[in-house]
Amino acid sequence: MQFTSQTDYWNSVAKSKEFTTNLNYGLIAPFIKPESNILDYGCGYGRTLNEFHEKGFHYLTGFDYAAEMISSGKKRFPFLNLKVCQDNKMDIPSDSTDLVLLFAVLTCIIDNEKQQELMNEIQRVLKPGGLIYLNDFLLNNDERNLVRYEIGFEKYGTYGVFELTEGAILRHHDPLRMKELTKNFIPVVDEKTLFQTMNGHTSNGIIFIGRKR
């Protein structure tokens, strides 16, 4: 059985989870202007868009499929344009966006086809030469993760998938998988890094900024 989104889980933690794959503004700053249209897919409660707002950007739109996350964001940051979306679709015209943010979103989508569907939608909304800035989690080789990867592989058929005790089903990625997902973008930044997870562990990660081909 494949789980491609877990709306109930993310709605349930909307008021308690703090996300940890943070914006590195210095990496993206050389490529954007104050008038840039910036879209955050999987925006949660809008924390990253608010950082851009504080730096003087105003054309900011966020999408998330968890309605409680959007509701929480509208209360915290009422000046942001936050919307609920479904099925990897964004109510945005084609070729209209300068920058799409995708922060720790692919980790929440365990199905290859659904991941690619989202990347195709991002390609659609980006202007020619527009940018994607994504960060996400890569495979780890410590015993705790290796055990849960094996359990997840037996249950879901994809190595790197695992369950959290509180109900989330997540995925850590092989670097080759990330290259496949980003093949339609010209790399501007492609870095390996370490991220803290929502539950306080450390994980291998990737930061990728690419230009639409």
Segments from the language model and where they lie:
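Short catalytic micro-motifs in class I SAM-dependent methyltransferases
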Residues: 104-108
